[in-house]
């Protein structure tokens, strides 16, 4: 049995606190673009390594930087005058020694990475011309020898932690968290883009709950070729606002909701108009790990890790595995009858098996009528089960079925 500790979470349940702030940076935000590219490159490398070598080799592609371009958006359609620059950095296994033949096998790391980045941008930013609007530069280097050794040690056995680090998670999501998360998903959904094509992908949702009132302040890029006048622009905002309000009803209880879109607008002299749908075209820069946490949100009223999850290797990088695992365990513990709220923290020790954390800390708020003592064994059982099946987490990540931002 791993070192699993269960204790009472000594705090007011989040939905009963007087104030809560929650943020989500949408997929077209420069920071989220970097997160998405980093993770897409990692998933693509995993696939390439498995196809060519039969196993996932050491890599970390969590160093992606975006330097904003320059554009002249105009009502009816403007143009890009300087492309967005994307730098792919990090470390990966580029060559392997075949011990039988003595030959070195070179692996197409850079080609795989650039293709993955471009494929992601094509799907994520619908109105971007990949031939003209963006430059993708790959500078991924060979991995550190000592860390590769930790990665490769007894490959047939349990992977060993690459670092002494921790992951955190919580569940269930509060009303505010659900609304913020689902609002961005709605505005960037295929269905909404088909209905309101002028809505760009660069969307940031900031949720504030004061008592029973939730205010959503939304920054939403508009794509200029679909907007011929200021009246069109206002109409786009009105349509989007109505969609957000309607969608939020699924998650609201007795809360009042206020939705504010592009509050910095000042008639036609200052509106959030873009050529591509992202502010990355207008000098806004981006980096991996500067935005959403592993659960897709930024939650200053909850415990968070500053570790970037996207792009890290899914085999033994604690910054990735334990953050994702913490959220999975929290979700399952929160499903136990009698658990109102749950927080998870998992700490590793470098070089130790990832199934044997230094500590796995579970904090719970029981529902009225339930005692911590009766819930504790069930929570420990959930945590132990996931530690024993941690390879399933890796499999989900490698297959691209886990959201990292």
UniProtKB/Swiss-Prot annotation:
Binding site residues for ATP: 141-146
Cofactor: Mg(2+)
Matches recorded under Gene3D superfamilies: 3.30.300.10, S-adenosylmethionine synthetase, C-terminal domain
Record's keyword annotation contains ATP-binding: yes
EC class (word): transferase
Pathway membership: Amino-acid biosynthesis; S-adenosyl-L-methionine biosynthesis; S-adenosyl-L-methionine from L-methionine: step 1/1
A Pfam family that the UniProt record links to this protein: AdoMet_Synthase
EC identifiers of the protein: 2.5.1.6
Keyword presence, S-adenosyl-L-methionine: no
GO BP term (any one): S-adenosylmethionine biosynthetic process
Family indicated by similarity: Belongs to the AdoMet synthase 2 family.
Described purpose of this protein according to its UniProt entry: Catalyzes the formation of S-adenosylmethionine from methionine and ATP.
Cited PANTHER family: S-ADENOSYLMETHIONINE SYNTHASE
Protein name: S-adenosylmethionine synthase
Origin species: Methanococcus maripaludis (strain C5 / ATCC BAA-1333)
């Amino acid at each position: 049995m791993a070192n699993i500790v269960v204790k009472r979470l000594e705090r007011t349940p989040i939905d009963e606190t007087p104030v809560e702030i929650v943020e989500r940076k949408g997929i077209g935000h420069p920071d989220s673009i970097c997160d998405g590219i980093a993770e897409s490159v990692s998933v693509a490398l995993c696939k390439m390594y498995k196809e060519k070598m039969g196993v996932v080799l050491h890599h970390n592609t969590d160093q992606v930087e975006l330097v904003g371009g320059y554009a002249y958006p105009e009502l009816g359609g403007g143009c890009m005058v300087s492309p967005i620059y994307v730098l792919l950095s990090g470390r990966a296994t580029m060559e392997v020694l075949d011990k039988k033949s003595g030959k070195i096998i070179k692996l197409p790391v850079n080609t795989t990475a650039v293709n993955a980045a471009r494929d992601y941008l094509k799907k994520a930013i619908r109105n971007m011309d990949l031939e003209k609007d963006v430059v993708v530069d790959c500078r991924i280097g060979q991995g550190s020898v000592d860390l590769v050794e930790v990665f490769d040690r007894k490959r047939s056995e349990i992977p060993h932690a690459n670092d002494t680090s921790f992951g955190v998670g919580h569940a269930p999501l509060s009303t505010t968290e659900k609304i913020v998360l689902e609002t961005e998903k709605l505005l960037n959904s295929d269905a909404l883009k088909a209905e309101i094509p002028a809505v760009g992908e660069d969307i940031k949702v900031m949720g504030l709950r004061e008592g029973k009132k939730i205010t959503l302040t939304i920054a939403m890029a508009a794509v200029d070729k679909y907007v011929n006048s200021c009246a069109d622009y206002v109409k786009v905002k009105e349509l989007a606002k109505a969609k957000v309000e309607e969608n939020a009803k699924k998650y609201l209880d007795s809360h009042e909701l206020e939705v504010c879109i592009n509050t910095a607008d000042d008639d036609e002299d200052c509106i959030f108009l873009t050529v591509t749908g992202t502010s990355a075209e207008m000098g806004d820069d981006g980096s991996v790990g500067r935005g959403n946490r592993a659960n897709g949100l930024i939650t200053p009223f909850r415990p968070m890790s500053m570790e970037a999850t996207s792009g890290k290797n899914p085999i033994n990088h604690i910054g990735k595995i334990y953050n994702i695992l913490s959220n999975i365990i929290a979700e399952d513990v929160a499903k136990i009858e009698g658990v109102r709220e749950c927080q998870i923290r998992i700490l590793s020790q470098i070089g130790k098996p990832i199934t044997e954390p230094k500590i796995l800390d579970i904090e719970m708020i029981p529902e009225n009528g339930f005692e911590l003592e009766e819930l504790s064994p069930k929570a420990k059982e959930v945590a132990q089960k996931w530690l024993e099946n941690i390879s399933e987490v890796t499999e989900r990540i490698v297959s691209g079925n886990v959201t990292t931002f």
